[in-house]
């Protein structure tokens, strides 16, 4: 993996020459991650293949989408998802912002749009059910993510974390976490940062298990997902 690109004076990243800081949870958390992700990948493999077919045949485009996110110790990795947007989504979004300046303010504040013009019909269903994130099980097995942890962010989002960024960087980003079970997109970005900080400061394997079990009703009820 490549290191995130920022100046050496940045407070957000731990310089490589100082040595890597071990992620929270150590071997216990990593063992749980590998076991849980492997079992989930096996159990959901029929659904995985069905979604692959639906995405491919919906518009003939690519099945997966990988976007660069910042992980543990500031390392950059490609966060995998099933593609839920049009192939030329950036052009569509630029035109949408030109016509709807208020939407740009929503985007700048949360990095999300409640009515995103780039999302396909199949993609909207996958997002509503959080099924677009199933490929992140592969990120977990590869050691880039964890089952539970802070929401993976892009590089410029860490500026919104301010001094709390150091807590984000101590953990691998998670497939689920406090933010996902507490309203997701219905909560402010500042609240999301507070959730991530609280999680890292108070980590325990038992807390991870509680979050995993609470994720099930949150996903089934589509709380805050769009």
Swiss-Prot record:
The chain crosses the membrane at residues 34-54. It is found in: Cell membrane. It holds the Pfam family Bac_transf. The keyword Endoplasmic reticulum does not apply. GO terms for molecular function: phosphotransferase activity, for other substituted phosphate groups. It comes from the Bacteria. Pathway: Glycan metabolism; exopolysaccharide biosynthesis. GO terms for biological process: polysaccharide biosynthetic process. It is a single-pass membrane protein. Keywords: Cell membrane, Exopolysaccharide synthesis, Membrane, Plasmid, Transferase, Transmembrane, Transmembrane helix. One of its GO terms (cellular component) is plasma membrane. Needed for the addition of the first sugar (galactose) to the isoprenoid carrier. May function as a sugar transferase. Belongs to the bacterial sugar transferase family. This is Exopolysaccharide production protein ExoY.
